[in-house]
């Protein structure tokens, strides 16, 4: 029996003006692709063009009247070989990474293991204030056209302009909220009893990529105080550094492609 050929992988993403990748959702997917050793190309897509690009495709929209489609979208494009699957569009990092696990089972990227599930209950609240801080910086990294679309979507979702939403959540208060939560997560990591820097020990998984992608997002958009607050904890900094630096996740520039 002839094994199915792996598809070409195309990642649609909204770039920044000066930084090609900034979204924590996209970073999470790229980390997974690097971990699997899978090549990919990136197609840049301005924020207002997202819906018009994917509405004619087989990608099923979300049940969300504000954002029916969200970046990143990954196209698994068939190479047309024996037993190849048809083209498939996917969005939402968890679904995309589950697909990658079916294409290349090793190394696995556990999502719902007992340790990853427990970790999520601790790092989720710890990183929520960092996400709230970072979103206020996003418009400054976008092109004028994408910035306009991003701000319109945020206002539609929150019922108020982004700058008003941010002003209601002062950064110093969010950092105060984050401080004990980050400490609790660092203590949990330190006391995990496993060898290695990651949640499962020596092997990085989906949860580790989620954590690092959020920290990188904060750093890339300019939320330096939020990033530094997390990195002040040596155990969190170790997880981050091992994933980004030792595994060289950020040192492999993707091919930028256009799709006809």
Give the label of every model feature segment:
Residues 2-152:
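GST-like domain detector, emphasizing the conserved glutathione-binding G-site
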Residues 43-48, 199-204, 253-258:
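Acidic carboxylate-rich catalytic motifs and surrounding loops in phosphoryl-/glycosyl-chemistry enzymes
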Residues 235-244:
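Intrinsically disordered, low-complexity polar regions and short flexible loop motifs
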